[in-house]
Amino acid sequence: MDTLSERIKWALTKPELPEQRDGKTKSKLRKEMEKAERVWGNNMIGQVDNGNWTTKLGEELVFDILNLKGENPRRPETRSRFKPDWETDNYIYEVKTSNWWVDGTAGEKVLGTWIKYQDIPEIYGKPLIIVCIARQEHELTYGKTKYFGEELSPKTRQILELAKSWGITYVPFSELCKNYNESS
């Protein structure tokens, strides 16, 4: 069963926040939606109760898109104790995925991913692309600290330019899958 279109739709479509109904609070409805998303995600990766389902789903989603684009994705070898998610003939990819119902500051660690992986371009001899999927993309587009879009602060622009000068770029998943999404 090919689930690519369904997975892309999940990654690009922020769900509506629940409204109180049927005597259930918004909080209770939110928990139900989070559980349903987790069950769906585990189904997409062929597992039952994997709490980290977004990691596998996001990585596989990026692999499938890169494969469709003819970029020859594969698992890179470990170098200097680093093992990024994917390597193609021209790039190294690190995938960051958040489910839609994660709360709090869970997604903030992606802001420093470029620092953690600052040496990857030199180690592998290829630029690093950090792909942000689902809520991770949404937060970096519409949240307090924007990495995507036109409304970047001057300091954030400086940070992203520094990362770029090191061979590191953040890319929203919507951009990575753009051509596939338009033709499907």
Question: What are the functions of these language-model segments?
Answer:
Residues M1-R75:
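Acidic-basic catalytic patches of nuclease active cores, encompassing PD-(D/E)XK
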Residues K56-E60, W114, S153-R157:
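Residue-level marker for well-ordered alpha-helical positions
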Residues V62-G70, Y117-Y124, I159-A163:
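Hydrophobic, Leu/Ile/Phe/Ala-enriched alpha-helical segments that form helix-helix packing faces
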Residues E77, D85:
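Core catalytic machinery and nucleic-acid-binding channels of phosphodiester-processing enzymes
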Residues F82:
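Beta-rich catalytic cores
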Residues W86-N99:
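Conserved catalytic cores of phosphodiester-cleaving nucleases, focusing on short active-site segments
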Residues T97-E151:
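Catalytic cores of nucleic-acid endonucleases
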Residues I129-S184:
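Domain-level recognition of nuclease-like catalytic cores that cleave nucleotide substrates
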